[in-house]
Amino acid sequence: MGACGSKGSTSDKGLASDKDGKKAKDRKEAWERIRQAIPREKTAEAKQRRIELFKKFDKNETGKLCYDEVHSGCLEVLKLDEFTPRVRDITKRAFDKARALGSKLENKGSEDFVEFLEFRLMLCYIYDFFELTVMFDEIDASGNMLVDEEELKRAVPKLEAWGAKVEDPAALFKELDKNGTGSVTFDEFAAWASAVKLDADGDPDNVPESA
């Protein structure tokens, strides 16, 4: 996994307490479907799926995707909104990161669009941000997009199941709460989770490369 987020500004509720009407079983089934829906693998079959998926996203047939096309494709083609109400936030993070990195690759790519060269990269980031969102929402019991110290302490078994070693929950909270506000944002959690390589699904990603 490799993703870092910006400050969570969305007001959408988290998934942890089923405030969006989904139960744990529903989320697990949706998560498995999304794993199958996003062709991230470096295989000929997955690449062919990406070619077909790119064409479905590229409604204007320009050979490049603007953000609105990416967001629309994630809703209409991949149906990622079945998983979380925060699709726009997740896809925007992934789109921005992929196009920024893609524009630096051999001076190719566009600053405003994602081309096929960056498409797999973007899909990997979408998957990463979904995984980070799953973990954060499981910890954020209140659904307010902030994790307090008590929520973190209660989540220690989950953190350890995802691969973290937590010997001192209080010390970990101080480490995560970089600005000392008394709560941990999605951005702070995502940076730490990526650094320690937390894995919610047991399927570690390869380092994203070109299409």
UniProtKB/Swiss-Prot annotation:
It holds the Pfam family FCaBP_EF-hand. The keyword Repeat applies. It is found in: Cell projection, Cilium, Flagellum. Ca(2+) 2 binds at D140, S142, N144, E151. Ca(2+) 1 binds at D58, N60, T62, K64, E69. Residues 1-29 are annotated as: Disordered. Ca(2+) 3 binds at D177, N179, T181, S183, E188. Changing A98S: In strain: PBOL. GO terms for molecular function: calcium ion binding. Disulfide bonds: none annotated. Changing A100V: In strain: Miranda. Residues 15-29 have a biased composition (Basic and acidic residues). Keywords: Calcium, Cell projection, Cilium, Flagellum, Metal-binding, Repeat. GO terms for cellular component: motile cilium. Changing R33P: In strain: DM28C. Residues 45-80, 81-116, 127-162, 164-199 form the EF-hand domain. It comes from the Eukaryota. SMART domains: EFh (SM00054). Belongs to the calflagin family. May contribute to the rapid motility of the trypanosomes, playing a role either in flagellar structure or in calcium metabolism. Could alternate between a GDP-bound inactive form to a calcium/GTP-bound active form. This protein has four EF-hand domains, three of which may be functional calcium-binding sites. This is Flagellar calcium-binding protein.
